[in-house]
Amino acid sequence: MAISDSSYNELAKQVYNVEPSKAKSNGDLVIVAGKTVKDPITKRQYRVLLVQDNNNDAHKTNDNGMQAMAVAPIVKGDIDTSQVVIAYAGTNAADSRDLDTDWQLLIRGNQDDLVSGNIDGGNFVIAENQLRSAQKFYQQVKRKYPHSALTTTGHSLGAYLALIVAAE
């Protein structure tokens, strides 16, 4: 069964809830692997297979603000990993790393590492850019589910990441 436009849209909305503070501000539960998310229009359910939240990663080099999740539809009670959707979160205006990514990656076209903070004052962090993190997450999903048809979705910055990753 094909994944509907409304499901892609809902997954692109739900991926923001991978980040705990965003889930809290949305009044939702944090999305973790094993959770089920639902498209309210089609009533189709999806099992969350993998998540990545680079806002809460222990490795500072990953601290770039990228969030993503991989889901598979639940068909007749079974998880159908023949098709997996990777959803990327878009810009969170309250997250300076997302705003820095928008500036560096989308506006300036700079695909080098992400530089966040006060560069002139010497108080800055260099982290992998979100596009590289998105590509790595895609490869991780592809390795774990090698026989799956992978598709991507996202809004805003997440749509950019989804389009570039899918085009590669």
Residue ranges and their predicted role:
Residues 13-14, 18:
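Substrate-binding/charge-relay-adjacent region of secreted/lumenal peptidase catalytic domains
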Residues 153-158, 162:
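Gly/Ala-rich beta-loop-alpha elbow adjacent to hydrolase catalytic centers
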Residues 2, 7, 21-152, 168:
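A conserved cap/lid and substrate-binding interface adjacent to the catalytic center
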